[in-house]
Amino acid sequence: MFIISETQRTFASFFIFGLLNNILYVIILSAAIDLVGPSTPKAIVLLADIIPSFSFKVAAPFFIHAVPYIIRLWTLVALSATGMVLISLSPTNVISWKILGITLASLSSGLGEVSFLQLTHYYEENSAIGGFSSGTGGAGLFGSFLFMVLTNVMGFPVWVVLLICAVFPSGFIITYFNLLPLPMHEYQVILQQQQEREEEQEEEEYQQQLQDEARSQNIESIREVKYSVNYISKHVQNTIHKITPLILPYMLPLTTVYISEYVINQGISPTLLFPLKEVPRWLISSYRDIYVVYGFLYQLGVFISRSSVTMGIRIKRLYLLSVLQFINVMITLYQSIYDLPFHSIWWLFLLIFYEGLLGGASYVNTFKSVSEQVSRTKREFSMGCVSISDSLGIVTAGCINWWLELKLCHLQVARGRDWCLKGGSL
């Protein structure tokens, strides 16, 4: 009988969590040109796919500790499954329903990322963080590959593929109850009283102030003061105080990398086109297919580099990755405007793959650095906060792309190339 160790079960569980949490996000972005058409900025789908997730992750540090993991799990399953059904079955010409479905799936993704990164705190860090990071990279690879094969190669209707994906979230429940081992130390809902005990030095000052206010105002109990506007204000200030040290070493470099790569992916790559007679026809039969292939190659690079930490590969200079990714933006922007420096799509395939390598390396090395450098008592909170960074970068890129993609397309049309206006739709 084949027996796997707890370490292997931990890695496998978090790999599945990462895979399932990100796969719908990837498939939705892969289907962007089908959902809104070639002449509409793909930034619409990108922003709908990320703003709800980003908003949730910004708000999560203020309340997520009070929600048990099992409730979070069932909530994200319901949100993601409902979202995919809405996207796939809504009428073709009613984009608003598709955007609502994307929004629900995005909320699920944000809840999942915060929750599973916090859950890694209770398991061996290399197995848990490495598994989740590899899983998120695997989601990009598997999701983009699945979508490319089913639509580009096999010719399935996009709405059918999206409807099939609605069953994926059930894997969260199966994995959580049947594969995930018991934690190294017990986790529980962190009520306010427990949070105060863990952060005694910071909270003692606030407790004393609350007691003084209670006595001076003749309030019957400290509990009434704790939930007053003044207490909430102090709690917010305390949370912001704990987030501030994370910004420069971890959050800023990850944010800038994501700005660069999503400007390329959703703003520039829809205009990185070549004559159909010069591309591999077994894989690409329309200009829409080129966009899908770019997405797969990017996700392939992400998967490989996100798995690198499990092989002992570490990059501690996080800002170096930011600089290298920005150079990629400049190269692809020049290519879109002047058709230089590449005269073959194969070189662009290689560049997009390299872009994915940088993005995945930035993600996994950032969270690995947090796990190594932040004290255990603050690590769970820090993981949740740093997870905001990638979403912030994507939101920023989406705002840029709203203008950039149309501008680049208009420049190409002005010089006689209208390929960016051609594609497919759902």
From Swiss-Prot:
Broad class of where this protein is predominantly found: membrane
Q: Would the keyword Transmembrane helix turn up in this protein's UniProt record?
A: yes
Q: Which Gene3D superfamilies match?
A: MFS general substrate transporter like domains (1.20.1250.20)
Whose protein is this, by species? Candida albicans (strain SC5314 / ATCC MYA-2876) (Yeast)
One Pfam annotation, family name? CLN3
Which first-to-last residue range defines the signal peptide? Answer: 1-32
Q: What does this protein do?
A: Involved in vacuolar transport and vacuole pH homeostasis. Also required for cytokinesis.
Query: What superkingdom heads the lineage?
Result: Eukaryota
**Where in the cell does this protein reside?**
Vacuole membrane
Membrane topology of the entry = Multi-pass membrane protein
Q: Which gene encodes it?
A: BTN1
* Keyword Magnesium belongs to the record: no
Which UniProt key words apply to this protein? Amino-acid transport, Membrane, Signal, Transmembrane, Transmembrane helix, Transport, Vacuole
> What are the BP-aspect GO terms?
L-arginine transmembrane transport; lysine transport; regulation of intracellular pH
**Protein name (database record):** Protein BTN1
Q: Which family does it belong to?
A: Belongs to the battenin family.
Give the InterPro entries listed for this entry.
Answer: Battenin_disease_Cln3, Battenin_disease_Cln3_subgr, MFS_trans_sf
TM spans (from-to): 44-64, 67-87, 99-119, 129-149, 154-174, 243-263, 290-310, 318-338, 340-360, 384-404
Provide the Gene Ontology terms for cellular component.
fungal-type vacuole; vacuolar membrane; vacuole
